[in-house]
């Protein structure tokens, strides 16, 4: 594993732990070159997932890209990193269980919204406003109304 601080390719694992009922491994690493310590996470990927984007192009599913969009929605919200990882694991599990090797970006967005709706309503609204291309305050009012009814 490459050190994110100095670029050295020779790092050592100091500690490994199974997390989230064994669905991923948390590793504490040490760089012998610069002395930096950092954490990595390994996740299980059962099959290659291809995402069909709105414009028709196709690309490999990028967990980190999806995770970043969720983290933006959750910024300054009282949700732990572990809970975000659990949310993403749940989304990926649903994708792999329900769909073939290809899935639309629309379905992925809906699965993320479904998970966020149960985790944090504010993050759900933030994510939905970007995902659903809200144009004005009426879009927010309509979504919030659907949450309270």
UniProtKB/Swiss-Prot annotation:
<protein>
    <recommendedName>
        <fullName>Transcriptional repressor NrdR</fullName>
    </recommendedName>
</protein>
<dbReference type="GO" id="GO:0045892">
    <property type="term" value="P:negative regulation of DNA-templated transcription"/>
</dbReference>
<dbReference type="Pfam" id="PF22811">
    <property type="entry name" value="Zn_ribbon_NrdR"/>
</dbReference>
<dbReference type="InterPro" id="IPR055173">
    <property type="entry name" value="NrdR-like_N"/>
</dbReference>
<comment type="function">
    <text>Negatively regulates transcription of bacterial ribonucleotide reductase nrd genes and operons by binding to NrdR-boxes.</text>
</comment>
<keyword id="KW-0805">Transcription regulation</keyword>
<feature type="zinc finger region">
    <location>
        <begin position="3"/>
        <end position="34"/>
    </location>
</feature>
<dbReference type="GO" id="GO:0003677">
    <property type="term" value="F:DNA binding"/>
</dbReference>
<feature type="domain" description="ATP-cone">
    <location>
        <begin position="49"/>
        <end position="139"/>
    </location>
</feature>
<keyword id="KW-0863">Zinc-finger</keyword>
<keyword id="KW-0678">Repressor</keyword>
<dbReference type="GO" id="GO:0008270">
    <property type="term" value="F:zinc ion binding"/>
</dbReference>
<keyword id="KW-0547">Nucleotide-binding</keyword>
<keyword id="KW-0238">DNA-binding</keyword>
<dbReference type="InterPro" id="IPR003796">
    <property type="entry name" value="RNR_NrdR-like"/>
</dbReference>
<keyword id="KW-0479">Metal-binding</keyword>
<comment type="similarity">
    <text>Belongs to the NrdR family.</text>
</comment>
<keyword id="KW-0067">ATP-binding</keyword>
<dbReference type="GO" id="GO:0005524">
    <property type="term" value="F:ATP binding"/>
</dbReference>
<keyword id="KW-0804">Transcription</keyword>
<keyword id="KW-0862">Zinc</keyword>
<dbReference type="Pfam" id="PF03477">
    <property type="entry name" value="ATP-cone"/>
</dbReference>
<dbReference type="InterPro" id="IPR005144">
    <property type="entry name" value="ATP-cone_dom"/>
</dbReference>
